[in-house]
Amino acid sequence: MKEKFDLVKLLNILKKNIKLLLILPAICLVVSAALTFFVMPDKYTASTQILVNMKKSSSDLAFQNVQSSLQSVNTYTEIIKSPRILDKVSREFDGQYSTAELNSFLKVTNQTNSQIITVSVTTGNKSESDKIVNRISKVFAHDMPKIMSVDNVTILSSAHDNAVKVSPIVSVNLVISIIVGIVLAILIIFLKELLDKRIKTEEDVESQLGLPILGSIQKF
């Protein structure tokens, strides 16, 4: 019975503060929309895929060659991000991007047990993301045989105007802002109730003063 009473009291508190529950999420929504559309910069990611094959001698078996390539994938990913590659890319862009900037744009990944390396570049310009990731891949493919004993480096897919917008994600930002607004409103409401020590109802007299109710004066 007490649980039911507490639930009714909780709902009454929320109902009494319904304006705050509506206004605060709306404010958060408007602020989030303004930041998303007018302040937060757009980010675009372009990707390429690269396959690296190890050189094999006449005594090598195909399976051993594949296993060796798989074990070397982590090394390849580090080489792509190394100054040896990025310095050259920076020079080919006539210093428009420093090595540090290129490294900050770059992300290199690969799936487990796969020889395929995915090179991704994220910038604020769609066409620049395409250009940079393609240039990094070409420099790596050209220089890799000189760095390690590899048979060939194949660019499986290049970026051709296929950079995708990765941020800001409008729908996610707006939903999060509404949730934040609701949570803030509820926190404010219950904080206000906890700090308000005034006796407002007969139940407050019984719970706070421990006195029985003998009678009450009705409002007219």
From Swiss-Prot:
User: Quick one: where is this thing mainly located?
Assistant: membrane
Which UniProt keywords are given for this protein, alphabetically ordered? Capsule biogenesis/degradation, Cell membrane, Exopolysaccharide synthesis, Membrane, Transmembrane, Transmembrane helix
How does the protein associate with the membrane?
Multi-pass membrane protein
Q: Does the keyword Hydrolase apply?
A: no
InterPro entries, alphabetically? Bact_polysacc_biosynth/exp, LPS_length_determ_N_term
Q: Name one GO molecular function term.
A: protein tyrosine kinase activity
Compartment(s) where it occurs, according to its Swiss-Prot or TrEMBL record: Cell membrane
Function (record text): Required for the biosynthesis of type 1 capsular polysaccharide.
Query: Can you say what this protein is called?
Result: Capsular polysaccharide biosynthesis protein CapA
Can you tell me which family this protein belongs to? Belongs to the CpsC/CapA family.
Look up and give the organism this protein is from: Staphylococcus aureus (strain MRSA252)
Q: Which GO terms describe its biological process?
A: capsule polysaccharide biosynthetic process
